[in-house]
Amino acid sequence: MTKKVQHRLPRAAAGLTMVFCLSSTFAHAQDTANPDSQDLPNMGQQITPLAPPGARFEPMNPDLTANPSWLAGQAVTTVASPDGKTLLVLCSGLNVVFTGSLTSRITSQFVFIYDISAHQPVKKQVVQIPNTYNGIVFDPSGTHFYVAGGSDDDIHTVTLGSNGTWAEEQPTSPALTMGHAAGNGLSVQPGGTGPVNAQVGVKPCAAGLAISKDGKTLVVANYYNDSITVFSGGYGNWSKGTELDLRPGKSNPAQVGVPGGEYAFWVAVKGSAASATAYISSVRDREIDVVSLSGTPAVTARISVKGQPNKMTLNAAQSLLYVVEDETDTVDVIATASNAILETIPVIAPPGVLPTALAQYTGANSDSATLSPDEKQLYVTNGNLNCIAVVALGGTNSGDQVVGLIPTGWYPNSVSFSADGSWVYAVNGKSPTGANPGFCYSGGAPTYPSCIPANQYNPQLLKAGFQTFPRPTAAQLTTLTAQVAVNNRFSFTESAGDAAVMAAVRAGVQHVIFILKENRTYDQILGDLEVGNGDPDLTEFGQAVTPNLHNLALNFVTLDNFLVTAEVSNDGWPWSTSARAPDVIERQFPVFYSSAVGVSRGLSLDSEGVNRSVNVAYPTLAERQFADPFTPDDPDLLPGQTNVAAPDGPGNEINTGYLWDAALRAGLTVRNYGFFVDQTRYNTTTNTIPLIENPAADGIVVAYPTNVTLAPRTDPYFRGFDNAFPDYYRYAEWAREFDNNYLVPACRAPESRKPAPAPTALPCAPHSQTARRSTGMPSLSLVRFMHDHTGNFSAAIDGVNTPDLQVADNDYAVGLLVQKIASSPYANNTLIFVLEDDAQDGGDHVDSHRSVAFVAGAFVKQGALISTPYNTIDFVRTMEEVLGLPPMNLNDALARPMADIFNTTPSAWSFTATPSALLYAPRVSLPLPPQPTGLVVPKPSHDATYWARASEGMDFTSEDRVDPAGFNRLLWKGLMGDKPYPAGPSGMDLRHNRATLLVRYRQSLKEEGRRN
């Protein structure tokens, strides 16, 4: 047997190792003698899918002729045939693979078909489906199965032929289509090179599927139409579908504007055609809608549940419905005869496995459940804990509990059993990504040199896993449970040293400023830094573009082993603001981000307060339409203020699981500058919010909040995400409030109708008694500086209209804010935390998640290189500890604060913001300090016309609507010239001999005529 490699390397060297070990585990899937772990460095966890005795763990290879080694991602649903001999595995995610050129790609989802008649799975076939979203079901005959078509708004029928091959049937008449012109929502569509137009309606999305016992009734959940469609007649004789809108106001005028039935996701059907009943999980409204299918479908009951209902399963007698719920991490057992909830089963861990201090927290992301054939156990997948919870069912519907945990791959989504119940089949959606320096895609102008796409975009690197093992015995479960506890660090306690450091920092710090930025990797920004493990060959926005970020790293701490937890902005904002991404986001983002590589599969960016682009922070239709006149005139469109993607707070207080909620619960103060702001009306052809540099001077509101808690705490004059608007003016608005509201009169800067030039240090003596938690500056300030995202070059104002200028603008805004605090009375009791929400927009030689992070203030070490492996969750936990806040969920409760970056006593510090020389270009009209004598102003790599032409057709209306892969390649070509894009991962530790490395790098810049 091949001995597998241990994973106890420092993260700086782990990028290459992670890729090798993942491949090694798959290649030697039957070797279970040494079930070594795989690290998840961006999560602080490890996985051990080979831990169950007799386990196999293998990739999902669809055997594409054009790319035989490519592996599918996001396995989401398993279903066994009625005779238990065949297993289907549905992959529903990004799954776009380039096969040699820009125009040659496969854009399919996949159904893997396995023979499990002899327990060990044998792959027989892979069927390609254009689009899908979780839903798949066998016909009771076992000779057909149905797959919901996602944004295609249809159902695919796949039939077993006489030759033993499965094939999709061509649509019959009438076809199994739902006939939706659009979903319920607001769609923001790009309008060519100019402004955008907001349009009513989003793409539909066919999700869960269920069929009656006799095969005569088929029900599909219409996720974005808040409805179900019912087909009658059976295979070969299906009638045209009948739709039932599940929203109360659509069937009862007295209930117009009452929430209910929205985000219909999963379906279970009880009974046969003549008397069938459907149960539908409404994710947003936290209810199970009970629908009678006799005659005209009608809602007969709504069963309220505490969590977000996900997948469901019926027992064989169809007397009990098991509903898995995220947010609560529970399973509700519902009696189908009475619609009563008989019991609620916690499914995080067996009693006593979690330390008492952790028992109050949730965050397991429970997402599916399957009954064993003997119905003595219920297997529940806990996505965020990478395990299956085994629930012992006593038959009394009371006192059932978890008796063990089984390790799985990363983010399990579904599990099935063999017919006799002796074997288990589990699938997961993710895998470690490793390095991605070859993130390569030829985008932009057609004259650019072509490039073979490397399929290294972050979500493309997330590969599905298929785990199979004999059903564990009770004794084996004990061992496996202990392994899950180790994998998730359930026994973690903060060391005495860390606790002492954090206590000292907490005692001296009263204010935290949290700056959130966009999408950059470590190598893109700090690859050319004098210290640390950076690769200058991957540096696109180096010292010449980002002098302030470089100075922050050198003056304070260089975090060269910091990994963001998220893959993209859709999950990046939840991870950055709440230390978790709910299952609804984990399920949606891989499908949504197919648009990032040129394939639209629908869904929306729900993680910043809008749901389907509708601002649900406002309680009434009139208020919504005042904030956004594009809002459809429909009181039943997502009524109420529930945000489907927001995490819960303690005690499952709905939607209050964010960092600012925790601060407010602790009696602290919060001010918001740009977080959770509606972007719909930026750059529109009508109803536009104007691009003005100083909206406060004219009293023009430019920020309409999308979070209920933040709404009264949001600066209405601080513009949200908009690439056309420089971060300098965002800083200026923050500084206006700071000067006017948080300084004593002698320290205030004068008011101005135009932003003043960057101020010098204010001659104010510290007045520490004024700058306390109870008065003065807020305890927690949220500041969004987003211009490092770059884009929208044709509309950008004040000449800040190229990528390097926009990143330089972002860098200067960060520097100005740090300078402002450094020269203020708050210098000694404030910490400034700077984070990227994700690292999707570039390559890195260590890990695709490695990014920049900065911390500044009196308690931060100075001139230190810190290579401790930290991640976003640790970052959030650190801010919590500084503010004296308890953890929000299991993730941050198990995180280690970043104590290595702090001293226990404050040090004097200062900071002077330095504009990049690029910003002194003649066409840039930002109010900068006087140009230093002798400063040579380099020309930007290209002018705005070049960048506008190269990015024509790209959608910059919101983060991540643009094709990141194409945009990254466009940036590389425009900034780096003809320098070849790196071909593959190195994983090298480049901390040593940096002086020699950088001399060679700078010499190459001169030879190539570039600056960086």
Feature roles, as predicted:
Residues 13-24:
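Bacterial N-terminal signal peptides
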Residues 1-5, 28-32, 1012:
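Basic/polar N-terminal segments that are highly enriched at the extreme N-terminus
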Residues 2-14:
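Bacterial N-terminal signal peptides that target proteins for export
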Residues 462, 478-1012:
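N-terminal pro-sequences and low-complexity stem/linker regions of secreted or lumenal proteins
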Residues 3-4, 25-27, 759, 766:
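Intrinsic low-complexity/disordered segments
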Residues 24, 29-498:
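Predominantly soluble domains enriched in secretory-pathway, periplasmic, or organellar proteins
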